[in-house]
Amino acid sequence: MFILSLPAMASFNDLLESVSDETGVPTEIIKAVCTHESQSYHNGKRQPWPWTLNIGGKGLWFKTKHSAVAYAELELMDGTEPVKLDVGMCQINWYWHGNEFASVGELMDPRANIQYAANHLKDLKKGKSWEYAIGAYHSPSNQVRAKKYASAVLSSF
């Protein structure tokens, strides 16, 4: 089990506030998406975890950024196409969004990951509700799945 220490949580909250100020996406929305996407548990409390991968539907939590990036790079080199790889706190899908990043390591960076997710949520909102944007973040073409996902994310705060 991995634990975000109090200083790390303070730093995480500062990062969320900074990204919220830059993008206009409410801090609570960003935090809810991060926590839902990369959740780990400590003392029964859900928390986000930065060194998280999801490969083919299987969540993996790593102790360090280096180990997570190395594992992801091996998966990408194995020749299976397309690799179903979600990266970092906000579980950005490499197949759909990887071309926006120089490397998996860059996408794994918490600031880059959260910043990209917040900008993506902002783009998805398109004058609609944050609930709609959150649902489209997960399932842009399946409204039933999108609503279920948004409900699960929003129930966390």
For the regions a protein language model found, what residue spans apply to each?
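N-terminal signal peptide c-region/cleavage motif recognized by signal peptidases
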Residues: 5-7
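Catalytic glycan-binding domains that act on GlcNAc-containing polysaccharides
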Residues: 9-157
